[in-house]
Amino acid sequence: MSSIEEVHYKLRQDSPLYYDVYYSTGGVSNIGGGSDVWVRHWIEEIAPKLNKPFYLLIDRNRLETDKDVGIQAIYRNHPDFHTILDNTEKIHILHGYYEPTKIILDNADKIETNIMHCTLYKSLRAHHDLGLSWLKHFKSDFSWESKMLDVAKKTIWIGLSDTDYHKDYDIIDIPNFYEFKGDSKAVESNTVGFCSRMETRKAPHFLEDIPSYFFTRVDHFQEWRKKLNLKFNKSKLYQYRWEKLKKFLQRDDWGISHSAHIYEPFGYSIFQAVDYGKIPIISEDWLHEIEYPFRASTKEKFEECWKQICELDTNQRQGYIDYLRDKLNRYTNKKEWVDKYLEIYNS
């Protein structure tokens, strides 16, 4: 018996009679976006405290680049993947696909909870709202979003503001959290940093005429240039790698963050900017209750905000950063976040 066969045999022998399934599409070792960060937090903070036997199923094939992260993950190309699904009574979706998925359709009656990470009804119209002729978005089906709201016994929203669905569904609000770990010391540079995926609602085209650094996927950057005839002549491109994110954030040659992403559910890039001393330009639709002058939802307004920030000295920038950090401290309680989920998962 090969070593792989031995692992599979042991899994079958050790399988509990009753168990929950936690289902995800990513977040194990390859971190690409906010939903992956959420799943990683679940793995590190919630999974060890669950009081019921469970399996973590990842609905994609395991790659050679995938690494173990302290918890056993069963990938789609594992021979027991479908058997585990068939024999469970409860499925908790940590992060699912944004279009109809056979596995979910076949097990719809078992969906206990579903984590809602974004609002498709908004993000799929982002190109219209930004005046663009092209939409860059991950594969998705608008109708699937409402279908999942109907199917899941409990829907949990990770964002900071209510969605339109809150009017018709009993949605549980558990906002994400962020732990400030940097010194938030203002950086004087006027170069703008963009640390995000280049989907349309992130509005990367705002930086067309501004000195800037992109920390993102090279192929997506090139796609934007080709589809919308953008030059980005004043921009430098750095290939995104999760393990290099902190180093990029710590650089002192960019001091302003392009965080003006419309329809932002939580806003990791805003928290990161504040954490590492980059004064952020944020969208006009994010946390209205915070009074902040540097908000933009158009390219022209973004350029205006950038010019205004360029006129600020370091002390003035520090004042805005300290102000935002104080306002955002309400979303830094990791224990509260963990406890709210455990109350649901362990009930």
What is each PLM-predicted segment?
Residues V218, K227-Q250:
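Conserved active-site histidine-acidic residue motif and adjacent donor-binding/catalytic loop
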Residues Y19, D183-K202, E208-Y213:
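Conserved donor-binding/catalytic core segment of Leloir-type glycosyltransferases
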Residues I115, T119-W157, Q250:
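Membrane-proximal helix-turn-helix segments that form the acceptor-binding/catalytic region
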Residues I256-I270, S283-Y292:
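Nucleotide-sugar-dependent
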Residues K122-S123, S161-D164, I172-S184, D219-F221, ...:
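Short beta-strand->alpha-helix junction loop in the catalytic core
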Residues L17, V69-I103, T113-M116, W254-S257:
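Short N-terminal targeting/anchoring amphipathic segment
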Residues D275-S283:
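Short hydrophobic beta-strand element within catalytic cores of glycosyltransferases
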Residues V37, S297-E303, E311-S347:
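A charged, aromatic-enriched C-terminal amphipathic alpha-helix characteristic of glycosyltransferases
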